[in-house]
Amino acid sequence: MLTDSGKIDSLVTNYVVPFVVRYRDNPWLWCIDLCNEPDWLYENPKCGQIPWERFQTYVAKAAAAIHTHSQVLVTVGVCMGPKYTARPPGSNVVSDEVLRARARGDAKARLDFYSPHYYDWMKTIRNNPFYQTPAAYGLDTNKPTVIGEVPAKGTATHTPTQDYENAFQNGWQGVMAWTSNGVDRCGSLEDVGPATRAFRAAHEQLVFPLGERAPPR
């Protein structure tokens, strides 16, 4: 699909737009991640080694459509953030400039925040992001940045509670643990629950800025 512009257009027109229009007022749909870990599509022969240009075209068109039809946020869960969403002079494959160029200058072709992933095997790239700022981690800092995927059991030598609090203190805008239902050895809600409850207790106004414990129905 990504290698065919017509098929990208068909996906956006026939799926992305109807989906967004249908659910744009649902308070539970706050963001759409347009692709999980596209790094592997680019690097791994088994995943096609698809050029970034083709992936960028898809993201640009889909993001522009989502922003045209809704206020839903858009991101891409890049696995190796310091490698592919790096601050200058590094390479940011999903920068505003790149995406606009793939969408004929459409300013709506953009991400709303970055969401790099982190697992301990990635420590050799630029160490553990929880214990440094996004800038120190080497990321482009022109948007908010969320750690979009991390083991629910926490990073090496740290508890999830330590990871969450340190991410906040270092200026990260959120953390999303993998996974809720324990499909692998990375953990489940049982592991990350104490961390999220501790964070809520320490920063309740931040977690519930409107004083509501659940989105209005």
Residue ranges and their predicted role:
Residues 1-111, 121-125, 140-143, 154-178, ...:
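Active-site mouth of glycoside hydrolases
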